[in-house]
Each structure stands twice: as C-alpha cells, then as structure tokens.
Amino acid sequence: MNNYNNFFVKFNNQNFSDFYNSDTLSDINITLSDNLKTVSLKLHRIVLFANCEFFKGMFSGFNESIQKENIIKVPNIDICCDIIKQMYGISLSEINRDWKYMLRYYKCCDYFMLESNFPENINVSRCEFDELLDLVDEIGYNEKTIKLLAQNMPINYNITNLPSDLLSELLNYTNVNSFIFVKDFSIYLVNNDDIPKHLTNTESTVICYVPNLNRLFFKANNRLNFMDLDTEYIQQINLNNVGIINSMLCDHNTNNLIINYKSRGESIESRIEIFDTDKLKITKTIYKTNKYNINNLCLSKDFSKLAFTLSKTTLNPYTYKEIIHIYNFLTEELCEFPDEFNSKIHCLKFMNNDKDFIYYLKKDYHYQVFTCINNTHHNIFRTENIEYLEIYLDKYILLNTGYSMTIISLDKSCMGKIRDFVGEYIITPNNHVICYGYHTKSLDISQIINNLAENKEIQITSFGSPYYGIKNIFFVNDKNCLKRRIEDYLKSILKTTN
C-alpha cells in the first residue's frame, strides 16, 4: 500500500467501499464544513469508530453519540473526504498530489487524530514559498515544519517579512548538506540526495571549495576559475605564471587558497603560494624550488600550520630523499623536519591536536604505517598493500588495502576489515565514512567500531550518486549566503532595540 492508504480499514480487514455515502445501513449524517464550502455524507458509526480516534471519542459519551445529524468544522473538506473514503477501504490515486495536498493531508490526519508521516522531502518553487509559509502557519511551527521552511527558502527571499523569532529558529536549519563531485572532467552538485546537477566542465580533478564564500575554484580553459554557488556565476582569473595545479587547499580562517603548482616559462618551478580570494590574485609565496617536487600538502585542523614534503628523484633509486616541512601561518616561519626518508611518503596528515603526524610508505617490500610523535617515528602497522589512509578521532586509522577497509587503533591492535569498502575516504560531520573512486558507499564509523568490537553485523549503504569513478567528493553549503543574511539582519535588529 502507498503512504496514503495504509492507515485504515482495521475493522476485520473488510472493504466497505460500496457503503461510502450510501443510504444502505447508514446510521449517521455528518456535515463537513470549512471556510469555503459544506458537504453532507451518509456514513456508518461502526466504520468510523473502528478506524479513527476522533470519531471514537465523538461517539463515546458526547451528545453526538446519539444525534443523527452532526456538523464538523474541518481544515479542508476535500482532503477530509479522502481520509473518510480510506476508512471505507477506498484507495486513493497518487496522481496530482502536489506538495500542498501532502501538507494539508498531514494537517487533516492530525485533526482526525490519525498517525501520518510528515512530508519532509518537499521541494517548493521560489514563487510558491509564501504559500508554503501560509500552510506551515496553519499546521503550526515545530522542528519539522521549520526545517521544511529552511530547506525551501529562496536565497534572495526578503527576510524582513518574517518575525525575528522565526528567523532565529530558521538559522538552526539553513545548513544544507549538499555535496559536489567530479566525474569525467565534469562538476556535479547534489542537493538533498536529489538527481546530480551538472554545473560546469573542468580540465582537472583538482578543485577547492571556500565555505565562507560559497565559492568553488577549479581549472578550465587553462585558467583558474571560480563559481559562485549562490548564483552559479563563473569568473575566469588570469594567473599567467600558473601551469599544472597539483593541489588546492582552503584556509578557513582567511578564506584564502593554498595552491601547489608548477610554473610556466623557461625555468619551471614547483611552488606553494597563497591566493587571495577577495583580491583574486596571488599575494605570497610560501615555498618555491626547481630541484624538488612538492607533495602531500595538508592543513592543521585549526588552519594555523601547513605541512608538505619535498622529494628529489634521480636515476639512482638509492639516492631518493624526501623531507617534511612545516609552515606556520602565524609566525610565517618555515621549519624543516630533522629526518630524511629514503621512501616516498603518502597521505601525510596531522594528528593529536595538530602536534604530530601520521603517514605511510613502502619499505622492505611492504607498506608500513608510521606515527611521528614528539619527533619520534613509530611503526604501528605493516601490510602488503595500502592505497589510501584516513584518521578518525585521532584514534582509529582507516586503510584502503586494495580489497577492503582495514580499521586499526593507534595502540597497534587490528580492529577488523570491511570487504569491498575501498577507494578514498571522507569523514562527514555526522560520523559517516564515504568511500569513493571505484564505487560510492557509506557507513556509520562510530557504529562500525562498536559492531566490530562486539562481532555484530556491519551495514553498508549506498551514498548519493551510484556512479563509478567519482573524484573529489566533498560537502558544500549552498545556503551559506542566506545564513549570513539572516545573521546580519538579526544583529541589526538587536542593535536597534538596544
């Protein structure tokens, strides 16, 4: 049964459709009235009593229990008639059930004291948002209705039309967990698990999102570009010296980009530079070299430090050398790590409140995971293959070992393996791990760790788009502009009242 036809006909599972609004054995006339019209129905107490708490109460001890004629003022006559039809076993067509019907149906079910799922996944066009406001006002304001308003509020809506207490509540729900992914040199946006929307093309899978500006930076037509996700406006940026961009990171404290690229020209250099997203130009060079390759850029969680590696490859494999460097944005000091590595470092990441590091490399024909704590390196895991590494809560290491995800804890104990959960990993704010690259899957990492410890079944679900070969999936907030407008408006009201 569909969502509209699964509450009723409890009375011995009989179908009384032929008796709806019929003189046959009818023992009560009910007149439904709303603000627009009136409808009279010939009904049967036993059917209404068996299927509806509202009528059960009505027929138990009140005057209506003995009256032949009863008048009921209802929110919407047409929908209330539909609900009574369902009590008689009449299935309703799903055709032409727009969002207005769904919300009014929910309100009428609530009026009749019937359980009904709130229609949370409603999409309303911008021109209909005021109608949505009116309907929510009729239903009442609660967590679900306010969340629905926040989900559908147009970014450019005139927020001065709304009371400040409602805006304060809306502010809690304006963060929309949308995500962007790159596939086949195209960039897609997905809102609320909807169909992926093609935004633009790109020459590189290296893209970067600046959350405070709600801008997406990418390379196209041999130039750096940015898209304003509020308006989908694209602007090209001339950076004449920038060649191949290897990576881009966002400093959330300043909204600047940290770009690692190879320069154009006669003297090709590897560079790390700061790009000002306001002035749209490079403002500072952190490091440049024509002798080394720059790899493994990573930012600390507080965005105060940048770590990267310098590597030099020669024809002699025994002379390979890689060094870790750390740049402090506050002091503008660049420090060289005291140790040199004879193997290539992979997935360098900060850990332990940004004081230490974790990484892996290939050594003695095996891949080995190391932590660097207080400048001392510790080998904590060894396996035949590692393709990616992520760390969770500074305590658990998630390894893509080719055929499975291996979870190990920093005390060197192996927690377990999850087969076919491979690719690169991203950890969401609600403790889900998404793997992407080969396929796209999701699991609740906190629950998984508990289940592994207790030998319980592990549940893996698909996530978002079912496409294979997704690159650079990350979360964005396409309502960031609206959130800032509400915050600024509420601050201005507060200043005025004070």
Curated annotation (Swiss-Prot):
All copies of domain BTB, residue ranges: 26-96
Family per similarity comment: Belongs to the mimivirus BTB/WD family.
Name the UniProt record assigns to this protein: Putative BTB/POZ domain-containing protein L67
